[in-house]
Swiss-Prot record:
It comes from the Bacteria. Pfam families: Ribosomal_L19. The gene is rplS. The lineage of its organism: Bacteria, Bacillati, Bacillota, Tissierellia, Tissierellales. Signal peptide: none annotated. GO terms for molecular function: structural constituent of ribosome. This is Large ribosomal subunit protein bL19. This protein is located at the 30S-50S ribosomal subunit interface and may play a role in the structure and function of the aminoacyl-tRNA binding site. The keyword Ribosomal protein applies. Keywords: Ribonucleoprotein, Ribosomal protein. Transmembrane segments: none annotated. It comes from Finegoldia magna (strain ATCC 29328 / DSM 20472 / WAL 2508) (Peptostreptococcus magnus). GO terms for biological process: translation. Belongs to the bacterial ribosomal protein bL19 family. The keyword Phosphoprotein does not apply.
Amino acid sequence: MDIIKTLEDEQLRENKFDFHVGDTVKVDYLIKEGNKERVQVYEGTVIKMQGTGLRRTFTVRRLAYGVGVERTFLINSPRVTNVRLVREGKVRRSKLFYLRHREGKAAKVKEKQKF
């Protein structure tokens, strides 16, 4: 058995977040400022998921004052307290880097219809 794999399995977080590329999510992120702690909510579209196990990351993109901002989070980070699904997106790609070059309505992802 691989030693690194066994160590990672011990530290994996129990509550898995259920979201995919193209979904719009709200990420609750713990921020320390001096001796204070607060939770900052970051909402955007998941454009990339990468890695496996303990090193799994996802990148969220949003527009802030007309400028595209991307932020990468570790799924198993203790600073990521919660990831809430706002809406499911209908995409056929694993990486949505083409959204970086689009503006306005063209940068939106269609919503997945549930029947």
